[in-house]
Every structure is written in C-alpha cells, then in structure tokens.
Amino acid sequence: MIPDVSQALSWLEAHPHALKGIRRGIERETLRVTEDGKLATTGHPEKLGAALTHHWITTDFAEALLEFITPVDDNLDHLLTFLRDIHRHVARNLGEERMWPLSMPCFIEAEQDIELAQFGSSNIGRMKTLYREGLKNRYGALMQTISGVHYNFSLPLEFWQAWAGVKDAESGKEQISAGYFRLIRNYYRFGWVIPYLFGASPAICSSFLKGRETALPFERTEQGMCYLPYATSLRLSDLGYTNKSQSNLGITFNDLQSYVEGLKRAIVTPSEEFAKLGVKDGDRHLQLNSNVLQIENELYAPIRPKRVTKSGETPSDALLRGGIEYIEVRSLDINPFSPIGVDAVQARFLDLFLIWCVLADAPEMSSDELLCTRKNWNRVILEGRKPGQTIGIGCDDSREPLAKVGKALFDDLRRVAEVLDSEAGDRQYQQVCDELVAAFDDPELTFSARILKAMKEEGTGRVGLQLAEQYRQMLIEEPLEILTETELAKEQEASWQRQRNVEASDTLSFEEFLKQHGGS
C-alpha cells in the first residue's frame, strides 16, 4: 500500500541531528484586483521596484500577477514572517487595489484585458515578455492568471553525509541527486495527499469557462458559480495550466542524465501544433520558437529538481554542473484562510512529507508509470472528498480506500514529527499530524470543503472580495517585523538601478540576442 519505511525511520531516530538545518523558500503569486474585484489594468507599481531585478517582488505571467519570493531560510517562523512583511509592504503601496486571495481568477471579462508582464527595454526583459506572448498564444492568457504557492526545500549536507555517506556537496552530487530523484518519484506516487488536504479551488466563476469546452460534470449555483461537489483543486486539473503535448515527452525522474536529456530534447523538438501559430507575424514575434517547449521553464510539473543558475546558464546546465540543490513543490493552491496564501501547518506538513519521500523506497519509474500516477492525482483533484473514494496502488487495478492510505502515511509522518520535535523541544510537528490526519475521517475539514461551503453561500466572487478586503486591512495595519521601510526603499531604488545597468550593458540587437538564446 505504501512503502515499508520502518528501517529508515529507525535510522532517522538514531540520527536526529541529520535534519538540523533544513532550508526552505516560498514563492507566492497573487493577482492585483480593483476594489470591485476586476483585474487591475495599471502597470506594476513603481513603488514596488523593478520587476526584472527586485530580489523579493516580481511579476509572473501578467503585469497584474504579483509574485513574492523569500530568501532561503533555515528557520520556518522567520521565513513566514518575512513573507508576511513583503505582503504588508505591498498592501501599503497598492492604493485601492487588493491582492486576490484565491488561486482561480474571477472577474476577467476578456482575455485581451490581460496585459503581459513588462520588464523594461533590455534584451532579457523583452525576451521574458515574448516568452509570455508565446504562452498566451499557445494556452490562452486566462490559464496563466491562475495563482499558486511554490515551496522550495533542501535537506542539509549533514543529512546526506549520514544517509548516503557523501563527503561534500561537490563529490557527492550524484548521490545527493539520486536522493532527490527518489523524493520526486515518491511525490508523484503519493503527492495527491497535498491537494486532498490543501486544495482550495473546488469552484470557478462561469466566466472562466466562457467559450471553452469541458467534459467535467459541473454543477451551477444561481449566481453562476460552477463547481464539482467533491473536487479539491481545479487549478491542478486539465482546466488549469497543463500542456497536452508534454505528456508524450517521456521525461523521467530516475537519474540526472536522462532527466536533463529529456528536457533538452523537448526544447529542440518541433511541434506541429505550435508551428501553426507562426513564430512571427510581419515584424511582430508571436513566440520564441515553435518547439514543444520554448524554454525549459515551460515544462509543466507538480515538482521540479532545481539548482540556482549562474548568469547565462539554463536550468538543465546548472543541474549537470552541480547536481540537484533543492526541489520546488508546485502543487499548493493559494490558502484562502491565510492573508499570505500559506501557513505554518502546511509548511510543517510539507517538511514531514518530503522527508518521508526521501526515506521511502522508490523503484525507478518508466514514463508510462509516471502517466499512470496521474490517475490518482486526477481522482483526488476532481472528486477527492467523495465518500468511500479509493486510490490505485501501483499501475495494476488494485485499489485501497483513500482514507486508509492517508492514515497509514500519517503513522509514518508522526515518527518523523517526533524526531523533529525532539530536536526543537516542542510538539509543533506532532500537532500538525493530529490536526491533519482527522481530515481522512472527516473530509469536511479539508480546505476545499471549507471554502466550497462559503462559496455556495456567497458565490466565488464575493468570497474572494471579502477576504481580499479583510486581509488588506489587516496587512496595512500590522507593523513590519523583520524588514524595515528603509531596507525596502533601498531595495526598490537598487532594483531600478540594476535594471538600468542591464539595459545599458546590452551590445546585441534583440534579433541577434534571440538567435543566441533559442529563438527562431
């Protein structure tokens, strides 16, 4: 049902120090909206600095889609407070605009209302916008305004020294990477637990479906909200951002070499479908190229192996150079019950689950098995709270009750929690287990059930507006705790200077620059 990790857990209990110094980072996306919930049509606020070069505040797909990025931190409470400080600062500098507190956008009337993120006149800035133009033409702009939270996680070197016998990160990069790939394979097999507990997009505004075909059996409320009664995360469904042509790429997560080869293959494999869009219309670029992926970042995945890139380096070249440095978890919806879109319970759960994913045995996976793990995810995404819901075990037809598998997993997570708590001298991780395991016996405790109840009563739009206003007031009134106004002003000015420097250092024409960077 789940891998037997009793030996690994016994090892962990004998090596509690191996988990000291886990490092994390959080990225949170949120749409800027007007006081009546419509997508903001203003440019990225100047007071928030230059989106191209600011260390903590940038934009994602759209000019109105803010993204907040924390520095790497080995203290969870400090990390979340830093993220809250960014939110406090932004709330004070948005005028009458608010941050939309849900993953799914609502009051967007027409796709042409969505302006692509702008990054200045430098070649790299223009290329970033052109990449987004390609995404818009390939998948539609509305899909790209869906927001989420990314959780970046790495285990300390001490863990790998004790667990895999490595000496240092440089000589041990193969073993460390193998350990993270094991984590990723287990995440594909069991990560559906994340949308089960924390999925918070069971409903959408009807405007989101306008002109789109869907086979999903939506129910509708009088206000025009569309929902699936047992859904957890429509953001992660095919309604959200998935690339059908990617499922045939055959990218696997068994070792560094084959993963990178698969990724590099995808960025040079022509796509008939995308070629039909054209690459240029006269002088106007429509996409970077017509390959299956314009660049590596276009690969849709619920989890990614990562390494910080050096200047001019692609993500896959960075991985080949130094191995996997950390992993990025991409399956979290915005938490509507938190003013910052994520909370400590979720972060602690992810710590526990990701540690378990490293410890648990994970046989290699073919691309076929990878596709078959998607069935469990889809079942949880679309009807995870259905009474008596079952989960497929492996790729044959055997199934077990979801609640039984979930509770078995939590039996293991509790032992990991005891190790982390014994080091910290408290019970915080065990309390997370107590709180979350109850949701397997009572699905009404899940985020999706709680938010759907409110949405059925008030409508998606009104729930979003009420929370946005409540959080705006709260964040504006709260004092900063870690950052200071002086530091924020300094970073704002420094970011503009960095952007000017980038623009001044360009030597190539945009066309030449594109040719050098995979454009066509």
UniProtKB/Swiss-Prot annotation:
It catalyses: L-cysteine + L-glutamate + ATP = gamma-L-glutamyl-L-cysteine + ADP + phosphate + H(+). InterPro entries: Gln_synth/guanido_kin_cat_dom, Glu_cys_ligase, Glut_cys_ligase. Pathway: Sulfur metabolism; glutathione biosynthesis; glutathione from L-cysteine and L-glutamate: step 1/2. Keywords: ATP-binding, Glutathione biosynthesis, Ligase, Nucleotide-binding. It holds the Pfam family Glu_cys_ligase. GO terms for molecular function: ATP binding; glutamate-cysteine ligase activity; metal ion binding. HAMAP family: Glu_cys_ligase (MF_00578). One of its GO terms (cellular component) is cytosol. Coiled coil: none annotated. This is Glutamate--cysteine ligase. Belongs to the glutamate--cysteine ligase type 1 family. Type 1 subfamily. Its EC number is 6.3.2.2. It comes from Serratia proteamaculans (strain 568). One of its GO terms (biological process) is glutathione biosynthetic process.
